[in-house]
Amino acid sequence: MRNVLLLVLVAAALFAGCISGPKFTCTPQRSVTLPKGALLVDVRTQKEYDEKHLDGAILIPHDSITNHIPGFSVNRNAILYVYCGTGRRAEKALKALNSAGYRNVINLCGIKSAEKSLAE
């Protein structure tokens, strides 16, 4: 009985790792030059933005981006570059903006890779 219980616990632990969901990966952009009229959007929290953000970036947290982007009078054809800490929230923002009709949204991934892409 003890061995069966141990086997069940080991199997449960192994299967728990299998159902954790897909791993997120973000491919950084290479050598980005912001075109005139493009908008650089930091989709992190206010606290993260206050600690560090890219020059020229505006803060619009990812969970409220579709509510706040119209306040910036952004044309739906404008180019929007979004970034966060790792690229995950920026990807959520990109999908939300695409669903709202914005088609030129580019995920710069995390702030470090975005900074590097813009500096090249």
Region locations from a protein language model:
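Secretory targeting signatures
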Residues: 1-17
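Rhodanese-like catalytic fold shared by cysteine-dependent sulfurtransferases
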Residues: 2, 18-38, 46-79, 88-120
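Short, surface-exposed ligand- or partner-binding patches at beta-edge/loop junctions that are enriched
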Residues: 83
